[in-house]
Amino acid sequence: MRYKITIEYNGSSFSGWQKQQHSANSIQETIENAIFNFSGERVSLHCGGRTDTGVHALGQVAHFNMERQFELYRIRNGINYHLKAIPIVVLSAEAVDDAFHARFSAKKRYYEYRIINRYAPAALEIGYVWQVFNPLDVNIMREAARHLLGKHNLSSFRSKDCQATNPVRTIDDIDIVQNGSHIYIKISAISFLHNQVRIIVGTLVEFGKNRTNPQEMLNILSQCKRNAAGITAPPHGLYLVKIDY
């Protein structure tokens, strides 16, 4: 039987989603152990979006197969019981067709990056936002972001460790919302390159901080080199919001 679970987690204390050979601190392995403790079965968990160290999730999706059948509320509650005191929670569980795959069946992924833009230090949101002290021109950031919409070679916006053979991606939407000192950068696409969202955010922040001409984003795109773009924004401001299927 194949099950789909939707998961929320605080990524601060984990080594990222993916199970590591020399680390027992991945989100994947933590949940797999909770499933074993609940059901007595060893499973392999497959996620819809592999998050890096320190990245959070509001709506991560994963699937796994089990021999035994359980009522869905028992799966959710049973896993959560064995995750108590750990900042991971299963929000829901569903039975799905064997053809469903959390990664390959996804139609769109939604990320949100959270910034607090003020000089006074953040007290309540440490570890959940990126604090940028210099004033940001959000209108310039919006204009620069418009040039990233659509299908592009995004080599300038992927890490040197990115293993994707094709750097072309299509960004469906970039929305930048300002609410007082908080800035939310929301990006959606069917798939992303490694560190793509964080490099885009770091680049947009440099545009907003330096009042760079938004047209310069076209030059960054055309160079197709990582050093043409801005810094990689820190992981703790990034959230995987949801995945559409």
Curated annotation (Swiss-Prot):
Q: Which reaction does it catalyse?
A: uridine(38/39/40) in tRNA = pseudouridine(38/39/40) in tRNA
Instruction: List GO BP terms, alphabetically.
Output: tRNA pseudouridine synthesis
Pfam families in alphabetical order: PseudoU_synth_1 (PF01416)
Q: Write out the entry's keywords from A to Z.
A: Isomerase, tRNA processing
**Which residues bind substrate per the record?**
111
Annotated active site = 52
Q: What does this protein do?
A: Formation of pseudouridine at positions 38, 39 and 40 in the anticodon stem and loop of transfer RNAs.
Homology family: Belongs to the tRNA pseudouridine synthase TruA family.
The name of this protein is tRNA pseudouridine synthase A
Query: Organism classification, top ranks?
Result: Bacteria, Pseudomonadati, Pseudomonadota, Alphaproteobacteria, Rickettsiales
User: By which gene is this protein encoded?
Assistant: truA
